[in-house]
Amino acid sequence: MEQTYQYAWIIPFLPLPVPMLIGAGLLLFPSATKSLRRMWAFQSVFLLSIVMLFSINLSIQQINGSSIYQYVWSWIINNDFSLEFGYLIDPLTSIMSILITTIGIMVLIYSDNYMSYDQGYLRFFAYMSFFSTSMLGLVTSSNLIQIYIFWELVGMCSYLLIGFWFTRPVAANACQKAFVTNRVGDFGLLLGILGFYWITGSFEFRDLFKILNNLISNNEVNFLFVTFCAVLLFAGAVAKSAQFPLHVWLPDAMEGPTPISALIHAATMVAAGIFLVARLIPLFIVIPHIMNFISLVGVITILFGATFALAQKDIKRGLAYSTMSQLGYMMLALGMGSYRSALFHLITHAYSKALLFLGSGSVIHSMETLVGYSPNKSQNMVFMGGLTKHVPITKTSFLLGTLSLCGIPPLACFWSKDEILNDTWLYSPIFAIIAWFTAGLTAFYMFRIYLLTFEGHLNVHFQNYSGKKNTPFYSISLWGKENSKRINKNFSLLTMKNPEIFSFFSKKTYQIDQNARNITQPFITITRFGNKKFFLYPYESDNTMLFPILVLVLFTLFVGSLGIPFNHEGVRLDILSKWLTPSINLLHKNLNNSIGWYEFLKDALFSVSIAIFGIFIAFFLYKPVYSSLQNWDLINSFVKTGPKRILLDKIINGIYDWSYNRGYIDAFYARFFIGGIRGLAKLTSFFDRRVIDGITNGVGVLSFFLGEGIKSIGGGRISSYLFLYFFFVAILLLIINFLLI
């Protein structure tokens, strides 16, 4: 066992040869390297598989032995200062290593086909392998200096991967936005590291925790300064894990290839912030008020992420805001001190979200057959619908991932999310209400994505389709196709160009009621299809892309069994608590995570009921168009014309605008921060050109005219020179005489 731990230093370096060899090959033998490019995918998967097996072996030993291993090399700079580099293997490290490697392998296998026609295939796999190296180095770091080094490498890799298609201006802007936003958090992280080194004199985690605990216990430290340094450390996690208010980069990061989105959102970049807070939780827990601040940021992020997801048309952006909200649950759990629940949700969410992103990639891949390579169209749920019969495997797997994220048993996220929701009641009733309300919103917007993508009819085949924002709220286009900002008097579901509406599945016609309002830009306009006789249809992805999806389905189905929170007749089912025993004991002595069947079912019933209610609302509003037409009278009966109806329209449109415009936070930053910085830059440029350059140029001009003036006095006569000489000497003597007197 000891020998296994001694070789754990190799974990972050095993994937590193791939980017190095690809770079050397492209530099020295470009033609041969490109011709053998599929070989590099195999090497990437093979090396990461070795790391996965090594990590699983370490995890099994930790579950059985509950041990923590740290190895350090000292680099002595002088007698007063030395840097120590090493690696730390504990339950948190092994959990993160398994997440990174398992999801990384699935993403690499998936990418082999997804990126097969891309000219940047080799560059993609080089970036991905280096991304894995950076993240593995981060989770095995034994001190804050190593954390920061690999933290920056993770940020650099995310910059390269988000801007992978850098020739597209949108992608180039997105990677710059992610880079700049994360620099704000990283600068805070660096200042926090330096601040705690100034307080404790150590970068090592164990020494840092021990020294700071003693200083606080003996009241030998300034609490305000310590809290400020802790907030700076937390700022790094806020930016990296897309927590409010540094979350604005996350939806724009969807401009990268879909496999990148899966890796970033499941197991690498956004997970790094959660990992950092979990790693430093023994430090945060002894600092007054910082845990409350962490939980506050988490609960705000939960609510904002869920509300922003309600009106997104881009399937990947909808999933991105879902990630933001779920990361908020993890941050809330860490702020409440629910260490186990946070890590449990990190595990379950990682596999479910990877499944959803790879499923969305399969959908996008199939839609490109119809709309061409245009992310604005292939990722737009407005053009989707009716994909169930075309991509049945993708549809089923996406449905399972959706149900998991909604918290439906016995899927993975149900077990972890339910624990966090129950813990919130013990911490704060206000936070609990927000968390439970957002759980219902999660079920609503996730099934909205599912229904708009897979149910109904394939909307791209309606040639007169218009996507402009003039569709009423109450139609099937609710917050997904488009919505009218105008408050009209009456209500209708769909408006055709003639008063007869045709059902998709029958020839029966439906007459529009006279009270129905007219829509200038319809959601779907059904007219004659002209001379077109053939349509292209989406197709299921091939086995190389389906295999990772099916493997992630298995994880989504069964990974929740790791943390089943009850034991039965001496059989300990809660493997996760046993796995985390060393870390949990550092935080809570003799903590018992097991509960009885009755208590578990009582708590679960309420959370599942809320999720089912959200799903029901989504089905009611987003079911296929023909069903909505048949239920038009039912919906109309609930919404009568009058002042209440107008007020309801205003509220609904306000919520839609808030969600569609991301809470106007991006606009606020653009106006006050970006606009302010640009204004300051223009002012500085004006001051530099007019004042600084003006003084410099003025001295030169003054010297020129002074020289010209003196030159005009001298005409070449020696008598004039002598006269001026004696004149100035006389004046100088008079001045000296005056000063001496």
From Swiss-Prot:
Entry's localization field: Plastid, Chloroplast thylakoid membrane
Domain of life: Eukaryota
Xref: InterPro entries: NADH_UbQ_OxRdtase_chlpt_su5_C, NADHpl_OxRdtase_5_subgr, ND/Mrp_TM, NU5C-like, Proton_antipo_N
UniProt KW keywords: Chloroplast, Membrane, NAD, NADP, Plastid, Plastoquinone, Quinone, Thylakoid, Translocase, Transmembrane, Transmembrane helix, Transport
Entry GO terms, CC: chloroplast thylakoid membrane
Cross-referenced PANTHER family: NADH-UBIQUINONE OXIDOREDUCTASE CHAIN 5
Family stated for the protein in its record: Belongs to the complex I subunit 5 family.
Subunit structure: NDH is composed of at least 16 different subunits, 5 of which are encoded in the nucleus.
Protein name (record): NAD(P)H-quinone oxidoreductase subunit 5, chloroplastic
Lineage of source species: Eukaryota, Viridiplantae, Streptophyta, Embryophyta, Tracheophyta
Gene responsible for this protein: ndhF
